[in-house]
Amino acid sequence: MLILTRKLGESIVIGDQIQITLLDIKGKHVRIGVNAPKGIAVHRGEVYEMIQDENKKAFESDVKNSEMLSALWAQVKIL
């Protein structure tokens, strides 16, 4: 992990397209601004983890449904 020190108004640039700027510091809270192309998703860590969990659940559900449909189709073919 790269650790950088920044002052208010200073930025960090990631690649050619992402810029992160330190906007405000109040006590333990830090406000940052993220400037990135619309095609790049930007989420808080906890939101990203929730999205990943939901995607995993949806995938597992799709696999289970696919297996059930395959079993039903096999039974229909036998009849």
Swiss-Prot record:
InterPro entries (alphabetical): CsrA (IPR003751), CsrA_sf (IPR036107)
GO MF annotation: an example: mRNA 5'-UTR binding
Keyword annotations from UniProtKB, A to Z: Bacterial flagellum biogenesis, Cytoplasm, Repressor, RNA-binding, Translation regulation
GO cellular component terms, A-Z: cytosol
Gene3D superfamilies: Translational regulator CsrA
Subunit note: Homodimer; the beta-strands of each monomer intercalate to form a hydrophobic core, while the alpha-helices form wings that extend away from the core.
Family recorded in the similarity comment: Belongs to the CsrA/RsmA family.
Record protein name field: Translational regulator CsrA
Organism expressing this protein natively: Syntrophus aciditrophicus (strain SB)
